[in-house]
Each structure stands twice: as C-alpha cells, then as structure tokens.
Amino acid sequence: MSQDLNSGRIVVLAGPSAVGKSTVVRRLRTDVPDLFFSVSMTTRDPRPGEVDGEDYIYVTREQFEQNIAADKMLEWAEIHGGLQLSGTPREPIEKALAESRPVLVEVDLEGARNVKKMLPQVQTVFLAPPSWEELVDRLTGRGTETQDVIERRLQTAKVEMASQSEFDHVVVNDDVDKAVAAISEILR
C-alpha cells in the first residue's frame, strides 16, 4: 500500500441511487477549495448530460477487468445484482494526497466498506433520503432506467438503508444546501 494513501483527508460518500449524490458532489466540487473528486470507473452506460471523465470514466467490462488485474483499482465491486462493475482508480487519489488536497470518493456500500477496511482513517458519510417514499419518487421520476433496473436499484437501496449505522456520519439530503454544508465541514 502506498504511504500516500495513509495520509491526508479522505471522505467516502455513499448512499442509495437517486438520493442526490451527484447533485451534492457537483456543489462540493465548486464550494470546497482544492477538493479532489475521485471520478469512479463504471461499465454502465452514461445518462443524458453525463460527461466521460468528469461524471464517471466509462469503460467496457473487458477494460475494467484489465484495470483490476493490473492492480489499478483502490476498490471495485459488481453492483445491482451484476448489472455493472464500478470502482475507484488508485493513482489519481495517491497524486491528490501527495499534493495535500482533501479527497472525496463517491462509492456504493461495498466500496465504502472496502475503502474503510483498507484505510481505517477515512471518514465515511451516508447520504440518506428524507424518507423511503421520497427515494422511490426520485428514482422512478428520473425516467432514465427500465422498470427492471428500477426494481434492482430499489432492492440495493433497501440493503444500503439498513447499513447506514456502519458509517461515521449520516447526512439526510432533504435540503441540498444543508447537506453540502455538513459534508464540507467533514472535509475540513
């Protein structure tokens, strides 16, 4: 393990699909000076408006598996019942920490567990919806997924919601400004 990963401030953000992680991350990237946001690598297709290399690094399953084999991933997981692979590239985080920048890593539940296991000093944040009903409304209201995908994401969300006590911090996203302020404090 690189010494760079054992020093510096790393905040790991997780939460269910449609809880507003992307919105909160976008705001944090503008509001927190010097913040390094670790762009996750994924095998899922981009949603409308998402930019490769900015929102996610979009790759094929084969490319993702090559990165795993070459030990280029800090963590990775097969998520939503095998629907996609998603993970965190290692090198950009090492570089940001070497530059003494705070690091924000957005991952799923397994990713948060894996990073915490490898780097116990990280602060984990669970971004929670105001209610289950609100989460279902947000997910179905996006209009970007099929009913089958929505059902899988809701199944995953049930497991994630039941696991929030594992996190160092729980931030309820009923107001984006308040959620951003709370996570900004944790990053300081």
Curated annotation (Swiss-Prot):
Cell compartments where the protein resides: Cytoplasm
Signal peptide bounds: none
Catalytic activity: GMP + ATP = GDP + ADP
Residue numbers binding ATP: G15, P16, S17, A18, V19, G20, K21, S22
One Pfam family from the record: Guanylate_kin
All residue ranges annotated as the Guanylate kinase-like domain in the record: 8-188
Main localization, broad class: cytoplasm
Top-level taxonomic group: Bacteria
Gene3D superfamilies attached to this UniProt entry: Guanylate Kinase phosphate binding domain, P-loop containing nucleotide triphosphate hydrolases
The enzyme's E.C. designation: 2.7.4.8
Keywords carried by this UniProt record: ATP-binding, Cytoplasm, Kinase, Nucleotide-binding, Transferase
CDD domains given in the database record: GMPK
GO MF annotations, alphabetized: ATP binding; guanylate kinase activity
InterPro entries: GK/Ca_channel_bsu (IPR008145), Guanylate_kin-like_dom (IPR008144), Guanylate_kinase (IPR017665), Guanylate_kinase_CS (IPR020590), P-loop_NTPase (IPR027417)
Annotated Gene Ontology cellular component terms: cytosol
Role noted for this protein: Essential for recycling GMP and indirectly, cGMP.
Membership in a protein family: Belongs to the guanylate kinase family.
UniProt protein name: Guanylate kinase
Organism: Corynebacterium jeikeium (strain K411)
